Amino acid sequence: LPELPEVEARRRCLAANALGRKIDRVSVPDKRILDKATPAALSRGLKGASFTDVERRAKYLLVRTDRNSILLIHFGLTGALFFRERGERKPRFSKAEFYFEGGSCLHYTDPRLFGKIALYETTDDDDIPEIAKLGPEPLSRAFTFKRFNDVIRGHKTTLHQVLMVQELIAGIGNEYSDEIAYQAGVRPDRMTTSLSDGEVRRLYDKMKWVLKQAVNLNAELDGWADRLIIPNRGKDGECPRTHDKLSKKTIAGRTSYFCPTCQK
């Protein structure tokens, strides 16, 4: 499930390969991926245009064009981007394809079709409903400890849940919520009202650390299985520290993993 670090990695892929290239044509093999648009409308809006910039906001990419429009991409559960040069093999599950002059192509792939692509005729992020409602970015300097503390103290729910409310903190999902709780030594099913001041401070610091490390690693975390819980989530997963079997619990309909020894 792409969360903030995974979407940032996709942003880098698009920025490195697709910016400044003139779009020759757009193909949409599966129109179910489109939101508020038809394949013909998407093609009309982008044919002959160029992508000028790409930003990440929470779990979304905002791809700006030289026609004063924004291509919005949400990756759902299994969405990804693949860039290929002319003659290279087309990836499986390609749902939207942006062909550039010269024959190269940016593919949006999505086996399970939970992602969405939309084109907005605006340059203002706040004109996009999905973006306007989002909370602050957890890695921004503006998201201070005071703001984080206000979020935690202002909502009576579990730690796991409050970290994933996109209107409060943008970009954290199921896996990174677990990782933040693990690194802070706090059970994800703890009520926010039970957290001490020290635990809240530790959660804030570990949130920043976890997300920064994941972004720096391009969200490829398997090499850190001796430090992180994410590579160890799943059946028979063990705590990297104690090697105890991880506990699994459903919290508000979401599956969470934690170490019953390390996390209190």
Report the location of each language-model feature.
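Structured catalytic/nucleic-acid-binding cores of DNA maintenance enzymes
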Residues: 1-264
